Amino acid sequence: MQRISSLIHLSLFWAGVMSAIELVPEHQTVPVSIGVPATLRCSMKGEAIGNYYINWYRKTQGNTMTFIYREKDIYGPGFKDNFQGDIDIAKNLAVLKILAPSERDEGSYYCACDT
């Protein structure tokens, strides 16, 4: 029997970016099965996503915030092999794929933008 984990996908807005911009998660909670690829999406409202750098972070139960990905294929230590970030300019959307989720990937995921 496969264990089901739950990844919570929330948006985070960084200071220094105009207040008219909003990052909106596609879903607040994304159910994920161990080993089955999962996709998190975050859209930008109020501005073109191509004008900003998009970053993804994970917060674990211990409240540790860890950098996962920044646009232009920059990954945090240990994330490059199992995570894939992308920007869909046409849809004004940031995408983070977890290629083979495991129990250690459980947590709250945040998308953020900066210039």
From Swiss-Prot:
<dbReference type="InterPro" id="IPR036179">
    <property type="entry name" value="Ig-like_dom_sf"/>
</dbReference>
<feature type="signal peptide">
    <location>
        <begin position="1"/>
        <end position="19"/>
    </location>
</feature>
<keyword id="KW-1003">Cell membrane</keyword>
<dbReference type="InterPro" id="IPR013106">
    <property type="entry name" value="Ig_V-set"/>
</dbReference>
<dbReference type="GO" id="GO:0045087">
    <property type="term" value="P:innate immune response"/>
</dbReference>
<dbReference type="InterPro" id="IPR051117">
    <property type="entry name" value="TRG_var/const_region"/>
</dbReference>
<keyword id="KW-1064">Adaptive immunity</keyword>
<keyword id="KW-0675">Receptor</keyword>
<dbReference type="InterPro" id="IPR013783">
    <property type="entry name" value="Ig-like_fold"/>
</dbReference>
<dbReference type="GO" id="GO:0002250">
    <property type="term" value="P:adaptive immune response"/>
</dbReference>
<feature type="disulfide bond">
    <location>
        <begin position="42"/>
        <end position="111"/>
    </location>
</feature>
<protein>
    <recommendedName>
        <fullName>T cell receptor delta variable 2</fullName>
    </recommendedName>
</protein>
<keyword id="KW-0391">Immunity</keyword>
<keyword id="KW-1015">Disulfide bond</keyword>
<keyword id="KW-1279">T cell receptor</keyword>
<feature type="domain" description="Ig-like">
    <location>
        <begin position="25"/>
        <end position="115"/>
    </location>
</feature>
<dbReference type="Pfam" id="PF07686">
    <property type="entry name" value="V-set"/>
</dbReference>
<keyword id="KW-0472">Membrane</keyword>
<comment type="function">
    <text>V region of the variable domain of T cell receptor (TR) delta chain that participates in the antigen recognition. Gamma-delta TRs recognize a variety of self and foreign non-peptide antigens frequently expressed at the epithelial boundaries between the host and external environment, including endogenous lipids presented by MH-like protein CD1D and phosphoantigens presented by butyrophilin-like molecule BTN3A1. Upon antigen recognition induces rapid, innate-like immune responses involved in pathogen clearance and tissue repair.</text>
</comment>
<keyword id="KW-0732">Signal</keyword>
<keyword id="KW-0393">Immunoglobulin domain</keyword>
<keyword id="KW-0399">Innate immunity</keyword>
<comment type="subunit">
    <text>Gamma-delta TR is a heterodimer composed of a gamma and delta chain; disulfide-linked. The gamma-delta TR is associated with the transmembrane signaling CD3 coreceptor proteins following the stoichiometry: a single gamma-delta TR heterodimer associates with one CD3D-CD3E heterodimer, one CD3G-CD3E heterodimer and one CD247 homodimer forming a stable octameric structure. Upon activation, gamma-delta TR complex associates with FCER1G to initiate intracellular signaling.</text>
</comment>
<dbReference type="InterPro" id="IPR007110">
    <property type="entry name" value="Ig-like_dom"/>
</dbReference>
<dbReference type="GO" id="GO:0042101">
    <property type="term" value="C:T cell receptor complex"/>
</dbReference>
